[in-house]
């Protein structure tokens, strides 16, 4: 699974062009999903572009409102996402945890809303810079992962993104990534009997470090931000998977 998270970047034309170019450049592998998460206002346009050329790219949302309907200006709910045939949704990204004060209770409501609607979840976790030692990191991640208790993990992918590595150019290092991904998989198996839990890595992923990260048996894919906006760079990273 290789995911392009556009955040609040790009225009409709940029995204349509990206879909066309990536669809031509990637050496699509049935077992490696290629996902674009554009801004919500471009979900419909992205879906139309994907369908028009019968692209293997799958569509993801950056957000989901926990209720089916309600008074949340700017919200987007599961029914709306299904109208665009949205296959994935990001939940728990550190930027939303930080800037929108999202906690475990609201994240669980979003999680349930997505699963009930048949939308696969990419659940994001990660530690801040003051918790970079292994024990503090693991304790923090356990708390974040507690949201998944009593949940069928079959439609959930974990995205490990250390907060201090997002958009900073700092990479966690392959030994740290392998250690934390292994910990996540072992810990989740204590919450659920699903033995095929996928864990992808995010945080300053670039073309020059992606091959090493993907070479780890504990890494099942990548969640890429800024580097993914360039179709050529993203396609080259995907083709390494």
List the predicted regions and their residue ranges.
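Active-site loop-to-helix "anion-binding N-cap" substructures in soluble metabolic enzymes
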Residues: 1-241
